Amino acid sequence: MAWIEPEVTEKPKKPMFLCVLSSTKTAHIPKLSAAGKTAELTDYTPAGDAELMETGNIISVPVLPMTPPYDTPTPAIMTRSALKLTDAPYHFINSGLIVTPDVPCIDLKANPGEDIREPVAVMDVQGIYERAKLLAKRLRNQADHVVIGESIPGGTTTAMGVLMALGYNGNVSSSADENPLELKKQVVEEGMKASGLTFGCLKDDPMKAIACMGDPMMPAVAGLVAGFQDTDTSVVLAGGTQMAAVYALIKHMGLNTEKIAIATTRYVVEDKSANFIQLTTTLGVPVVYVADPGFGKSSMKGLHRYETGTIKEGAGAGGAMYLAGLFGITQDQFRTEVENVCKLLKAGH
């Protein structure tokens, strides 16, 4: 396949990349998230991702975000490479982190998400949404095209929960090669029960769907999208099933979705355990960009593992590659830069 499909033809004058960093205690459930060596270490993953994207290495976190069992390097290596190659302006947004990174972050004053099996998973959903909306209004003069990524371990499970509450059957993707779908479904069922919910019962109350079954990344991204409405700014949601869930929320909030696209990696699209394209088609997403970093041509074993589905997406990697494509970067140039980032990290061998 081509490096980015459909081909990116329109180059915006002022693109910007935003990455929302969040935590949910749902990630502490053993064997649920592979976005860290252990369930407890997932707390450090968003902070590690941000430090890596900003500096090319970790600063304050104790361990580089890796996916076991082969220590495949975090998708943030792709985002770091794209930001370096394009020199596009970017901001990190803290929306409920347990561990904060040692790099500049815009703080939305959100609490970390609780386990979705608790009656309330996200506190102050409306407040997070409004603060993110205000932030977007401040940024919109600086950008005509915004790519929004996320880093939140456990986020595919909360995505499934929100989709179910809104009335969508969404088999979500995973940060692991073996997608623990049955465990996710069990956790979501327990969460729905704890909140007294049934399938589709919150289709008219997306904010409550976030409060009961979601995570703090969701109201932040939805608020950002709301703040860029009524302008010429177009938005690309950078991610897989998590951003499909955010798109569903935005749609159910009654926001205009005509200028919202999704960009992800081919690893998400090819994930046989998920139904990503079916879901985005059902949701009516106008455009889904699919990026292929071509890691099969790499000499690094850690990057080869992406080709086998060991790791698929995160830290806005698909959207960051889409952004690189906007700037005319080729797949070979991109892959070479990723290898350089890995060499400096001593990761991916």
UniProtKB/Swiss-Prot annotation:
SUPFAM superfamilies: Nicotinate mononucleotide:5,6-dimethylbenzimidazole phosphoribosyltransferase (CobT) (SSF52733). One of its GO terms (molecular function) is nicotinate-nucleotide-dimethylbenzimidazole phosphoribosyltransferase activity. It comes from the Archaea. Belongs to the UPF0284 family. HAMAP family: UPF0284 (MF_01086). This is UPF0284 protein MM_0708.
